[in-house]
């Protein structure tokens, strides 16, 4: 390998900025004479990335919003591809944001540059033909989960399982008593965390349902307490409106602090999504619920190939965690499913501990080693 190394990274959202900064630290630890170029957020810039434009310009959610910004996104991608081809980095790493980064990777690879994609899109669940595009776009896929690595191996895509950064961040044994003390919760008695999602649409579909479920559980278990971490001020206001006119609940609303809520609780009622991985890593028994618009559900039923929607079940390869979806997600059913886990959730917890240890690979270090090995093979 030459003395100096130029690495291009492109991230499109906050989670990618976190992953990218960790990867940059690990790369510099192994190769001090390194230059970073590309697109990233404040964490990546703090590690020395010269960002060609603000990462926020790529962070768009929702079909209507994407359509409104499509001309700008296409223009920025075209300009970025041209700039990176001229810069001739030793390797280019696209971090998540596949709708933007895979197109960049494909063009750069056609121009003879090495390309890596960090964080697999959900090709194993739906639109599986995207794996053909991925195979053309990147020299190496860095997968966070072992089932993703198996999928890519089966489809002839070079892949490295690197583990998940959260598995190193979250301790193998969380201190429940300390978390309760920090949140002002009593040390004794049982606590259920209600986690209806971080987006307005999710909370709109699941918030009242989760509160109804809590009231049913309280009838059966009068000493129960609840915590609900709100992802933003807007989500807190949404929940507070839902609480108006209800029977009083022993409920503590938190501003953020989802990890504290998980550390403090005994079980979780949770929306399907990345938070289920956090609940798994905190070893908290859970019931997963999800509701979407009727038309969306019918479309997804036709498109989705996976038998499960939650990460714990995908990691287990079986129905370990109850999933109540759409019309099956009623207050009665959710309460009846969650209540036994407050008495004995050991079956879930034993698996959660095993998968935590399997994912605890020091992902940034593993990813850096894989990237440098790819560069050295050139």
Swiss-Prot record:
Sorted alphabetically, which InterPro entries does this protein's record hold?
A: Glyco_trans_19
User: Which UniProt key words apply to this protein?
Assistant: Glycosyltransferase, Lipid A biosynthesis, Lipid biosynthesis, Lipid metabolism, Transferase
Gene Ontology terms, cellular component aspect? membrane
- Lipid biosynthesis as a keyword of this entry, yes or no, is yes
HAMAP family named among the record's database cross-references: LpxB
Q: Which family does it belong to?
A: Belongs to the LpxB family.
Name recorded for this polypeptide: Lipid-A-disaccharide synthase
């Amino acid at each position: 390998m030459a003395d100096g190394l130029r690495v291009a990274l492109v991230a499109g959202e906050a989670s990618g900025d976190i992953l990218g900064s960790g990867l940059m630290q690990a790369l510099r630890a192994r190769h001090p004479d390194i230059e970073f170029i590309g697109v990233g957020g404040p964490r990546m810039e703090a590690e020395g990335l010269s960002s060609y434009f603000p990462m926020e310009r790529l962070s768009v959610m929702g079909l209507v919003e994407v359509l409104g910004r499509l001309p700008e996104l296409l223009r920025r991608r075209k300009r970025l591809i041209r700039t990176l081809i001229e810069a001739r980095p030793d390797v280019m790493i696209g971090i998540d944001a596949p709708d933007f980064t895979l197109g960049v990777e494909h063009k750069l690879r056609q121009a003879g540059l090495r390309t890596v994609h960090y964080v697999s899109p959900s090709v194993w669940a739906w639109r599986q033909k995207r794996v053909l595009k991925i195979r053309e776009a990147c020299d190496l896929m860095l997968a966070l989960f072992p089932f993703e690595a198996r999928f890519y191996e089966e489809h002839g895509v070079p892949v490295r399982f690197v583990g998940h950064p959260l598995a190193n961040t979250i301790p193998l044994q969380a201190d429940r008593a300390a978390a309760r003390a920090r949140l002002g919760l009593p040390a004794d008695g049982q606590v259920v965390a209600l986690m209806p999602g971080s987006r307005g649409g999710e909370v709109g579909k699941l918030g009242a349902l989760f509160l109804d479920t809590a009231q049913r559980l309280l009838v059966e278990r009068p000493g129960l307490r609840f915590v609900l971490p709100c992802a933003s001020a807007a989500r807190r206001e949404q929940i507070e409106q839902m609480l108006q006119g209800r029977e009083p609940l022993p409920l503590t609303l938190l501003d953020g602090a989802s990890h504290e809520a998980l550390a403090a609780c005994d079980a979780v009622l949770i929306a399907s999504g990345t938070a289920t991985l956090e609940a798994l890593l905190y070893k908290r028994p859970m019931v997963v619920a999800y509701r979407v618009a009727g038309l969306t559900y019918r479309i997804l039923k036709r498109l989705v190939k996976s038998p499960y929607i939650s990460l714990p079940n995908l990691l287990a390869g079986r129905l370990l965690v109850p999933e109540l979806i759409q019309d099956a997600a009623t207050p009665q059913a959710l309460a009846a499913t969650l209540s036994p886990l407050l008495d004995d959730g050991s079956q879930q917890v034993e698996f959660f501990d095993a998968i935590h240890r399997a994912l605890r690979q020091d992902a940034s270090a593993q990813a850096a080693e894989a990237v440098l090995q790819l560069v050295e093979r050139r």
